[in-house]
Structures are given as structure tokens and as C-alpha cells.
A protein has these predicted regions:
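Short, structured coil segments at secondary-structure junctions
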Residues: 17, 53-54, 115
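Conserved strand-helix element at the start of the C-terminal RecA-like helicase core
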Residues: 1-12
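Conserved RecA-like P-loop NTPase helicase motor core
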Residues: 22-111
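Repeat-unit-sized solenoid/scaffold elements
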Residues: 7-9, 80-86, 127-128
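Charged phosphate-binding loop/patch that engages nucleotide di/tri-phosphates or the phosphate backbone
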Residues: 109-128
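Conserved helix-turn-beta segment of the N-terminal RecA-like "Helicase ATP-binding" lobe
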Residues: 11-19
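A structural preference for short, hydrophobic beta-strand core positions in alpha/beta folds
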Residues: 20-23, 121
Length: 128
């Protein structure tokens, strides 16, 4: 949600005050997005037709099952012309205790197979 984007951006900014960390939603100026080291946004606000030059990492916190929505989120990442040795990364969270999360993860693995260089699953021993 828009409100949660603000809360997360404020929290991250308190942890890393030397970085430009901002919320970016549809009511915000596009320059906010471009000038941020870290931008916290919604899928809708930073979705279709929003170009984010130099985007290195996209972290999706929503459990999303839609093939179109997932492809759209993955599609935010582009080849980094200014950093040829860096490969952009698309990260997403899965709760193994929620069956729908597992189902959505399995769909991503299948749907992304021809769109990504690799797909790794990392398991943490704690819940967020």
C-alpha cells in the first residue's frame, strides 16, 4: 500500500542516512524515483511505462500469482549499460507456511525460466 511504502522508506532511511531513500507512488514526482538510491514503490506505481534507469535490484514483497503481473515486475530490470559487469537481480519473498505462496513461487520458476539467467531459492531459518 502507499502508506506501507512510506513506512518502509522511513525505516530504511533511518538505517542508512547517507543514502537517498524515498517512497515513490503515483502522486510523487518522477524525479523522486530517478534521484533515489533506494525507492520503495508499489507494483502499480512503478509498473508499466515507468522506466527506471540503472535499476540493479528489484525486491517484490507481494505474493503475486498473476503471470502478467510477475512478468511486469521482472521487466522493470534492464541490461545495465553503465555497469556492464553487473547483472540485475529480481528478488521476491515466499512464506513456506502459506500454500498460495508456494504455488506462486512455483509459477514464477516456470514462467521466468526463459526470461532469466538463473533462478536460485534461498532459505532462511526465520520468518519476516
Amino acid at each position: 500500500s502507499v502508506q506501507l511504502c512510506g513506512i518502509i522508506a522511513e525505516h530504511l532511511a533511518s538505517k542508512w542516512p547517507s543514502l537517498a531513500i524515498n517512497r515513490y507512488v503515483s502522486e510523487d514526482n518522477y524525479e523522486v524515483l530517478l534521484s533515489s538510491d533506494i525507492a520503495v514503490s508499489t507494483l502499480k506505481s512503478a509498473g508499466t511505462a515507468v522506466d527506471i534507469p540503472g535499476l540493479m535490484i528489484c525486491l517484490m514483497t507481494d505474493a503475486l500469482g498473476s503471470k502478467q503481473g510477475n512478468s511486469q515486475a521482472l521487466g522493470r530490470l534492464r541490461v545495465l549499460k553503465d555497469w556492464p559487469g553487473i547483472t540485475p537481480e529480481f528478488l521476491y519473498l515466499v512464506c513456506r507456511d502459506i500454500p498460495k505462496h508456494i504455488e506462486y513461487h512455483e509459477r514464477k520458476v516456470e514462467n521466468f525460466s526463459d526470461k532469466v539467467l538463473s533462478h536460485k531459492t534461498l532459505t532462511m531459518n526465520y520468518r519476516l
